[in-house]
Amino acid sequence: MKVEVQFVDLDHSESMEAFANEKLGKLGRKYDWVIGANVFYKKEQHNNEENYLCEIRLSAPGPQLFAHEYDTNFEKATNQVIKQLDVQLEKRKAKMSDH
């Protein structure tokens, strides 16, 4: 699976890119029909609190899959997004096997 990681208004982080690649690599091994992923990291301010946003778009057969999450750091946000995408991929897999 091809993974592209972008940092919006942030400095590039090799460790976060490696973390995203590791997590998405696990999804890619579980669902070998996933073609690629676009990961976006962004830090935002809401009510004087820092919120860390992770968005991931997956390319796979059928409509594109998307999930995003805010959390107290990028690792937690990424883990939540991966869980959401795993659920979406399971549903897609079930639909694909029905045909």
Predicted segment positions?
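N-terminal, polar/charged subdomain of small-to-medium soluble alpha/beta proteins
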Residues: 1-99
